[in-house]
Amino acid sequence: MPQEEVHDTSSVSDDNLTNTGGGGSNYYNSHNQPNVFVRAIRSIFGYRKTSLTLFVILTIIFTIALSLYDNNLDLTIELPTNKLENEILKSSWLDLQNIARYPHTYGSRANDRVHDYLESRIHDIIKENPYTEYNNDGEKVLYESAKSIVSYYESNNLLVRINGSDASLPALLLSAHYDSVPSSFGVTDDGMGIASLLGVLRFFAQNEQPRRTVIFNFNNDEEFGLYGAQAFVSHPWFKQIGFFLNLEGTGAGGKAILFRGTDYGIVKYFNKVRYPYATSIFQQGFNNHLIHSETDYKVYKEAGLRGLDLAFYKPRDIYHTAEDNIKNINLKSLWHMLSNSIDFANFVSNQKINDSGKDEFAVYTSFLGYFFSSPISALVTINSVLIVLFPILSGPLLFITVRYKKWKIGTSNFLSLPLAIVLTVAIVMIVVNQGFQIANPFLPSSHPLLLVATTTSISLLIYYVFLNGVNWVSPSGDQKLITIIEISFIYWLILIYVTHGLSQNKIGDDHTGEFPFTVLFFLEATASLFGLIGWTFSRSIKQSSNDGSDEPLLTGTAERYGSDDTDEDEQEEFRHHDGNTVKHLMQHFGYDWSLQYLLIVPISSLIIFNSGWLVLDGINKSIQESFAAENLIYLLIQLFSQFWILPILPFVYKLNRFIVFGLTIFAISGVALISFLDPFNQENPLKLRFIQKVDLNKSQDSFVEVYGRKGIFSDILSDMPSVKETHTKVECEALSDGLEACSYKSALAPNVIPGKSLKDYVNVEIVNSSKIESYGLLSGEIIITAPENRMCTLYFTKKKVKAVVIYNKSKSVNNFKSIPDGFSRDSKGNYIYKDVAGIDQLVLNKLDWNKNYHIGFDWLPNIDDEVNTLSVDVECYWADLAPGIGGGDNATNAELAIPAYNELVHYSPNWVTWANREKGLVSVSLKIEV
């Protein structure tokens, strides 16, 4: 049905519309009135303000209810009733409780305890199984982990292989990491992944032998370099693997989502899981580096495997904090990941996976338990057809309508929507960026939907006032259809951009998350075609006015039923328009508005809301990480609200006065709440990052350094008892991108090595200093002693070294020229890495708590150097909050290990959580000249 200026006669009295020429009597008399059922249908589906208001309210309820249901863990996941699965879940839950008893980072004794626990559990599960085998991966690797950064890692991954009946099939890898960060119990990251692996292992151990070999990698030290996965790449078992499923946690509970997949050929099999939950919107975010954290998926993909990344993704404000504990998760979260892992692994391990789609990115999503996926080539084809087809169909129809049906479209009618969009976007940008963002910048962390709802209300009011104003001054025959056509054109342009991007899709410029625009364009364009077809097959306005016909349509549009609460306004609008135009239009457009509304608004609203909510819910907490993230989130809030409004814009003229009043009240209330609500609370805390540093070049004094967003946490530090008692000043320094580092000299020295003075935490012995070799190279050799330590980093700040050596036992190393580029190992077992472009950082990770680091390096002095020495900054990290955990003679009170950290955790407000800044909670550094 055309816009309100077209006017369905259900809102106009009989004598206004159908007076006969002579006697002025009504066309219908009381004896010709339709029955109650027909009246009700006309009242509901007639183009009246009350009818539209009902539709809008139902649409909002439908959109929010379905989206909440689809994303709700408790409503969509059923706990198992099968006996075996129930036992597996109970066992995995107990495993999770044991794994997450203490923080268990790579640099902690609790990490060893978790390793030993897993080893014991694996042996219990696979014992007496003839086709399974266990291997404790002891690989040592030395490799370039980033540009000019070389990493050494000693692995203690736990590997299990379930040999398949068909050795010709490439194996399936299931992987998760068992280390946590120092500040977290690691329940979600990645305890649930490990517990799920144990559950899947038990499933296979108690069922028939699979066709395909399945390998489990319970890997270590993922958090600070993906080291466990990288070490496994060098293991002999890795060569037989073709596919993988990586289990991860970058949030803290909720539903496990399919983050990304290597290709369509493997992603499509996610439809075999019982509770699919997925969207390639997150894949696009990862591939375009909007999400900065990485998972082991990266290592496996770069090694040539095909697979999936299944992970928990929210909330990120308790991710890597002590709040990632067993109290804050749901048994159903574990079952969601575990059951989907069982289903996927069971299917892939017993089916032959072909190469179809292995070279194509996948576009995918899920809704209400159904999984949909497509190769991008198919989506490009569909989009291309739509881009070409709809102009071909709509162009002639529009020409016929304007040329022969006398549909007059004035300049003001044509420009009203573009001008309204420009005006609304401009006002909203000012309100949001200069108002909300300045008044309460971190509110998206706790109330993102309040910002979206308020912004949407303000935008709708602006559209309502502007578009109705233009329509009053310059009425159109069918402004609704004009608006639908113009929105279709907007989507058409967006679809061209999306299709071009998909046709050249690549990492760094990924468009796989933009698939919703295909559906949005199809719905809007189809509705525009219906409207144009209605005009095309109607009589022209001129014909209608000349034939003298007073006959109403069989639909009975001349009747008027329903409440009068809005009809007076509509009658006034009728009096404002030409009578013949109104009469003609109402005859030919009785109830098509409802068809157009139902075609466009409910589905479009649901797609936009659900997609927008998933994105916001996934990244809103990252507002605490940088100013760039803050700007991105506020931009997304505005885009979310503007796109959510688009489907309703063709009908905005008909909004009921009560809904307009409600929007006004809501907008005012929203602005007030945004101004006064606290951005952080116990459920949505502020996350701060901690490290305690000792620089032995200056003194044995320790300094607490805390990192967070600028200007919001210095008062918390100043309120610490030790700070107030010693009258210590908290000093803050602005960092880039809206961050701030605050520090203070701590009276609470670290005690991670009981009985040791801080000066004994790091000692460096220079074994060989500036020994001149051939080709003008200099070489040096040092031994680093760091008790109870697993992690150190060497920084070559002034000169890059050309080669590094991790000595095994012998000092004998081949001549520099004979050493191959990259990694090598000499006959004495020494690990060597050579890079003539230069190495400026060497990262060391070892398993033996008290073994020294024995390091050698070669460098080339600068021509203008007066002294041929190399400056080396040695920094070692300790991460153990409870060194006594795991046994040994070093048991101590956990509260005494890092008392400065414990003080902050204990005395901070309940709306603050704490995470580690570096790989440890304590670092001790020493600078030497070699």
Curated annotation (Swiss-Prot):
Belongs to the peptidase M28 family. Residues 71-379, 433-449, 502-514, 620-631, 679-930 are vacuolar. It is an enzyme of class 3 (hydrolase). Zn(2+) 2 binds at residues 189, 223, 320. Gene3D superfamilies: Zn peptidases. Pfam families: Peptidase_M28 (PF04389), PFF1_C (PF22250), PFF1_TM (PF22251). Residues 1-28, 542-570 are annotated as: Disordered. One of its GO terms (biological process) is proteolysis. Its EC number is 3.4.-.-. Glycans are attached at residues 163, 354, 620, 697, 768, 808, 890. Residues 1-49, 401-411, 471-480, 536-598, 653-657 are cytoplasmic. The keyword ATP-binding does not apply. This is Vacuolar membrane protease. The chain crosses the membrane at residues 50-70, 380-400, 412-432, 450-470, 481-501, 515-535, 599-619, 632-652, 658-678. The record marks 319 as: Transition state stabilizer. SUPFAM superfamilies: Zn-dependent exopeptidases. It comes from Candida dubliniensis (strain CD36 / ATCC MYA-646 / CBS 7987 / NCPF 3949 / NRRL Y-17841). The keyword Flavoprotein does not apply. One of its GO terms (cellular component) is vacuolar membrane. Its cofactor is Zn(2+). Zn(2+) 1 binds at residues 177, 189, 248. May be involved in vacuolar sorting and osmoregulation.
